[in-house]
């Protein structure tokens, strides 16, 4: 069997109790407008946000000549939007956007770009449901040559130590959730912090790089990750999702990080994974407005 991505998985499913999941992989899907409206209301910091054109540009890379070119470089991949609604055509409860990379068929890595639950729908299991849907959909997006691997799911998290006081207060108030409390949500779900400097390259020509982020991972079986696997995944993520198909070596922020990872790969090093204790201790020493409304 030829190893490939499966391109016909867009659908709507009833999950029970009136909750529906919508799976989107096309920029012309009419449901994308509802997703973007909810997404745009959930995120407020300019340099972390995609505009609608950015999402469409990413989804356009799932097919045609662009997919043929990029999959030849990076292997099979799928960019996916998942959206939960109350009723098939009802209000958005939450959503996630991710890209899954299958590499050579032996591993599965995922970058979870965005995940959110509507502020009025929290504590109802929607976040956990979305996380599981991301894992399941990533695995089901490819015709695997052998056993289906469990995914490594990479996440970007706001760094409560490096964020400016203004961004910290604005984002916490907008979300109704303190930055440290957000990290605790990821910690409870088994996430680890990838022990390496991380900067997200600019998402568009109008934006700047985001250095106020921590890179985390869920699903890692040990205390470290192979540097070669990290280099491959980050090159794919930067090249497809962040830079919309452009060469990551042509973007200085991406190229600098990839050069470090490539060198670590050459030396056969491993990238350590840590818990959240150190960042919590550091955050406790930084004066912040931690009065985000409930």
Protein language model regions, located:
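Short, charged/polar micro-motifs that form catalytic or ligand-binding hotspots
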Residues: 25, 45, 117-124, 128, ...
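A conserved beta-strand-loop-helix scaffold within acyl/acetyltransferase catalytic domains
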Residues: 36-119, 141, 204
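Terminal substrate-recognition subdomain of acyl/acetyltransferases
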Residues: 1-42, 143-294
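Conserved acetyl-CoA-binding loop-helix of GNAT-fold acetyltransferases
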Residues: 117, 122-140, 149
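Glycine-centered flexibility sites
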Residues: 94, 123-127, 190
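Short, well-structured alpha-helical interface segments that form or flank functional binding sites
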Residues: 107-110, 125-129, 133, 177-181
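Short His-Asn-centered micro-motif
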Residues: 113-115, 134, 155-158
């Amino acid at each position: 069997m030829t190893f490939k991505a499966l391109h016909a998985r867009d659908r709507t499913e009833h999950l029970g109790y009136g909750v529906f999941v919508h799976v989107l992989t096309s920029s012309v899907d009419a449901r994308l407008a509802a997703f973007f409206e909810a997404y745009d209301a959930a995120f407020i910091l300019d340099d972390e946000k995609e505009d609608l054109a950015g999402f469409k540009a990413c989804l356009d890379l799932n097919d045609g000549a662009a997919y043929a070119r990029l999959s030849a470089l990076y292997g099979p991949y799928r960019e996916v939007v998942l959206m939960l609604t109350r009723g098939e055509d009802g209000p958005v409860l939450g959503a996630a956007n991710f890209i899954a990379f299958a590499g050579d068929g032996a591993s599965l890595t995922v970058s979870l770009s965005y995940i959110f639950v509507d502020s009025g729908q929290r504590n109802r299991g929607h976040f956990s449901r979305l996380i599981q849907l991301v894992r399941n959909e990533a695995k089901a997006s490819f015709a695997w040559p052998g056993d289906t691997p469990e995914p490594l799911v990479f996440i970007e998290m706001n760094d409560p130590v490096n964020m400016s006081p203004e961004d910290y207060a604005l984002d916490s108030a907008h979300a109704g959730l303190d930055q440290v409390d957000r990290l605790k949500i990821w910690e409870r779900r088994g996430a680890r912090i990838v022990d390496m400097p991380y900067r997200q390259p600019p998402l568009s020509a109008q934006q700047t790089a985001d250095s106020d982020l921590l890179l985390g991972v869920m699903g890692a079986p040990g205390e470290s990750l192979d540097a070669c696997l990290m280099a491959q995944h980050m090159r794919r993520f930067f090249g497809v999702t962040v830079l919309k198909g452009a060469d990551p070596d042509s973007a200085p922020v991406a190229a600098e990080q990839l050069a470090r990872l490539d060198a670590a790969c050459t030396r056969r090093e491993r990238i350590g994974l840590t818990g959240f204790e150190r960042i919590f201790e550091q955050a406790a020493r930084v004066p912040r407005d931690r009065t985000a409304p409930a």
